């Protein structure tokens, strides 16, 4: 079954490349370069060091902002899920921040704090934080009260209860927030870099847009998507298997 799934996945990729090549040959235009042309630009970017440098800068911003948002979001989400009065007090604010456009937050952070790295990170964190809080809060509300009562009867401290009772139940929600967070946060980072940074993938994509360099836009996009896929395959899926091994 696994080999069949891999075969189907490979087949879908080959069909996509064939369709892409066909459209590129039919249009014969710079607006849709062929896969070969994009691969050549990708290789040149790697050899020159430009692509790895800007990709690394963006990934560093992603790691820092994502880590801050997840740590704060998990902590606040657990607190709100366990305390109804605090949840009622902050609920409207969560709804407001969930619906504030990312572009508005980014612009305000740059206006208030200047075109500095900390403002860029803050803008990304503010945009991601409400999503994490809401996801973890909903997960906390579904915690099995019987298990919590049992932990209390056995004299579990707060730390032991969190690690052995609360966290295993919250794991699916944390992984959901992580995956949706990666999908959201790198898009926000690109806008942040486009508006106020002098390096990174967003900055480069803005330059390529001004030059109508579609091949470079696609090459840089493919590079970033490939890295996100590697994070999923090498980090998130192994973590999932390890955390859920007790079910097997």
PLM-predicted stretches and their roles:
Residues 4-26:
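N-terminal signal-anchor transmembrane alpha helix
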Residues 26-67:
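Periplasmic/extracellular loop-to-transmembrane helix junction in inner-membrane transport proteins
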Residues 64-94:
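Transmembrane-helix boundary motif in ABC transporter permease subunits
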Residues 95-128, 138:
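Generic hydrophobic transmembrane alpha-helix motif, especially the helices
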Residues 122-126, 158-191, 219, 224:
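Transmembrane alpha-helices
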Residues 131, 135-177:
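Short cytoplasmic-facing helical segments at TM-TM junctions of multi-pass membrane proteins
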Residues 201-239:
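Hydrophobic alpha-helical transmembrane segments of polytopic membrane proteins
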Residues 237-248:
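Short cytosolic juxtamembrane segments of multi-pass membrane proteins
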């Amino acid at each position: 079954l696994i080999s069949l799934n891999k075969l189907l996945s490979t087949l879908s990729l080959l069909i996509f490349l064939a369709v892409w090549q066909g459209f590129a040959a039919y249009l014969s235009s710079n607006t849709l370069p062929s896969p070969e042309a994009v691969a050549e630009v990708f290789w040149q970017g790697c050899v020159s060091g430009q692509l790895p440098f800007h990709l690394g800068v963006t990934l560093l911003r992603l790691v820092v902002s994502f880590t801050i948002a997840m740590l704060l979001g998990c902590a606040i989400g657990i607190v709100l899920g366990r305390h109804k009065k605090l949840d009622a007090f902050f609920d409207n604010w969560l709804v407001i921040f969930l619906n504030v456009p990312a572009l508005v937050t980014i612009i305000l952070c740059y206006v208030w704090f200047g075109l500095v790295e900390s403002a860029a990170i803050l803008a990304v964190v503010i945009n991601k934080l409400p999503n994490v809080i809401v996801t973890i809060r909903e997960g906390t509300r579904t915690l099995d009260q019987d298990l919590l009562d049992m932990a209390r009867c056995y004299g579990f401290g707060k730390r032991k209860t969190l690690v052995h009772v609360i966290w295993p139940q919250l794991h699916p929600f944390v992984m959901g927030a992580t995956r949706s967070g990666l999908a959201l946060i790198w898009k926000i980072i690109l806008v942040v870099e486009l508006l106020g940074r002098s390096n990174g993938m967003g900055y480069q994509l803005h330059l390529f847009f001004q030059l109508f360099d579609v091949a470079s836009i696609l090459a840089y996009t493919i590079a970033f998507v490939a890295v996100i896929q590697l994070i999923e395959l090498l980090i998130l899926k192994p973590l999932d298997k390890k955390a859920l091994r007790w079910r097997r």
